[in-house]
Amino acid sequence: MQVQCQQSPVLAGSATLVALGALVLYVAKPSGYGKHTESLKPAATRLPARAAWFLQELPSFAVPAGILARQPLSLFGPPGTVLLGLFCVHYFHRTFVYSLLNRGRPYPAVLIFRGIAFCAGNGFLQSYYLIYCAEYPDGWYTDIRFCLGVFLFILGMGVNIHSDYILRQLRKPGEITYRIPKGGLFTYVSGANFLGEIIEWIGYALATWSLPALAFAFFSVCFLGLRAFHHHRFYLKMFEDYPKSRKALIPFIF
């Protein structure tokens, strides 16, 4: 049975992402994992970082991958399937590579459940729109929005992966010591990994030219931007020799 596009869930889901992003900025507190676990009660249940990240990120891959699996196989099929494939590539890496290499602190269980719900909902929203609602002209693959958007997506993913690699090298297995990250975009900002992911989703919003992707990019800017800001304050407080010229998220600006 062919699924018909319904605009109501698309609009509702997009509005929810925007509202969540605005709420993050209003609360102005970082989510309590990683460097900011001290904000939680000591008795809070925690899971090992690798298992936690795997469980949390899995729906963002499994939901769109499951929907894609029901579509006709084609390398350059409808633009919606190709763009959703890019979404799956990002979350394949986050689920099966990043999570298994993670050397972070134990992750609060309550945040895992929130993350699973968010990832499942957002994964479905992006998939539903691109597969059942999006309509692109025949020349979309050569459109400047698609080309520039995909370029930014790949660039941002490269920055994100390279920055995560730098962070992993700062800590030996089992260590919880923090050190000053150096190299790559960390030369200019404290949140190089966050900047890379933000660039990714801005590029994705441009390439898809869709409301759900734009709403997700907005949420990412709010959530990751705030986290970069608090990471920057953390480093400045912990290290007296932290580079004073380094910014939080945007080189030379913020």
From Swiss-Prot:
pH dependence: Optimally active at acidic pHs.
Compartments reported by the entry: Microsome membrane; Endoplasmic reticulum membrane
InterPro entries: 3-oxo-5-alpha-steroid_4-DH (IPR016636), 3-oxo-5_a-steroid_4-DH_C (IPR001104), SRD5A/TECR (IPR039357)
PROSITE patterns registered for this protein in UniProt: S5A_REDUCTASE
Matching Pfam families: Steroid_dh
UniProt family annotation: Belongs to the steroid 5-alpha reductase family.
Protein name: 3-oxo-5-alpha-steroid 4-dehydrogenase 2
Gene that this sequence comes from: SRD5A2
